[in-house]
Amino acid sequence: MDLRTGEYITAHQATSGVYTFEITNPLYFTITRHNQQPFNSKYNLLTFQIRFNHNLRKALGIHKCFLNFRIWTTLQSPTGHFLRVFRFQVYKYLNNIGVISLNNVIRAVDYVLFDVFENTIDVIEQHEIKYNLY
């Protein structure tokens, strides 16, 4: 849903994309929180954010696009290593498709978390998307 207007994102907006070779560094990955074994459980809680680059947002007609993911996993790898492998796998998936769009980024994250990484228990996705009005 568009945060600015409250309207649902149309299929055309979600699937319109840009070729991967046209834009360098289209996505920015950051880990916002890492809770190691909260409440003495055997799970780790990772919260990370994917931001769309200025050139990608300009090409797609987006004013702001933050995709926030909260992951429950039993992986015990260091945070930096997890982010580096995750980022590499997402870019690899997007390069195989050849087009970067909102739907393709979400599909890439889903593929990496549930097919590439093992021991992913649950993922909650929140987004902050604002399309250009003009």
Swiss-Prot record:
GO biological process, one term: viral process
Function: Increases viral DNA accumulation. Enhances infectivity and symptom expression.
Family: Belongs to the geminiviridae replication enhancer protein family.
Quaternary structure annotation from Swiss-Prot or TrEMBL: Homooligomer. Interacts with the replication-associated protein (REP). Interacts with host proliferating cell nuclear antigen (PCNA). Interacts with host retinoblastoma-related protein 1 (RBR1), and may thereby deregulate the host cell cycle. Oligomerization and interaction with PCNA are necessary for optimal replication enhancement.
Keywords (A to Z) from UniProt: Host-virus interaction
InterPro entries referenced in this protein's UniProt entry, alphabetically: Gemini_AL3
Signal peptide span: none
Short name of any one Pfam family annotated for the protein: Gemini_AL3
Superkingdom of source: Viruses
Name of the protein in question: Replication enhancer protein
